[in-house]
């Protein structure tokens, strides 16, 4: 699973997802890509599941680029804990994704193979996505 090696602070505010993605919204490595259409937090497990689905489907052909990285810690409190006594401990990492953001890219394969592999990755995502060609 992806996570930062080290961060400046252990815990972060939740923040809010406004507007569209102005960065990371163009295809820059491969020829085909999966683009987010909704805002969401995508966990490192979901990113990994999508990547695995793509690599298994494409077999040895082509190359895959993961364009998002989970750099935001999500804290959870233990079950049946009373309110107060501080913020919970970091449990997992998420990537903050806004509409327009490229999630995965693929190159070196035919369009129908890429379409099939990317649709498998899209089914692992918690949001609506679209397949785009550069």
Curated annotation (Swiss-Prot):
Pfam families: Ribosomal_L16
Source organism superkingdom: Eukaryota
GO molecular function: rRNA binding; structural constituent of ribosome
Any GO BP: mitochondrial translation
Key words of the record: Chloroplast, Plastid, Ribonucleoprotein, Ribosomal protein
InterPro entries linked: Ribosomal_uL16 (IPR047873), Ribosomal_uL16_bact-type (IPR000114), Ribosomal_uL16_CS (IPR020798), Ribosomal_uL16_dom (IPR016180), Ribosomal_uL16_sf (IPR036920)
Localization in the cell: Plastid, Chloroplast
Gene Ontology cellular-component terms listed: chloroplast; mitochondrial large ribosomal subunit
Primary subcellular site in the record, as a coarse category: plastid
N-terminal signal peptide: none
Similarity-based family: Belongs to the universal ribosomal protein uL16 family.
Xref: NCBIfam families: rplP_bact (TIGR01164)
Subunit composition and interactions: Part of the 50S ribosomal subunit.
Protein's name in the database: Large ribosomal subunit protein uL16c
Phylogenetic lineage: Eukaryota, Viridiplantae, Streptophyta, Embryophyta, Tracheophyta
Gene it is expressed from: rpl16
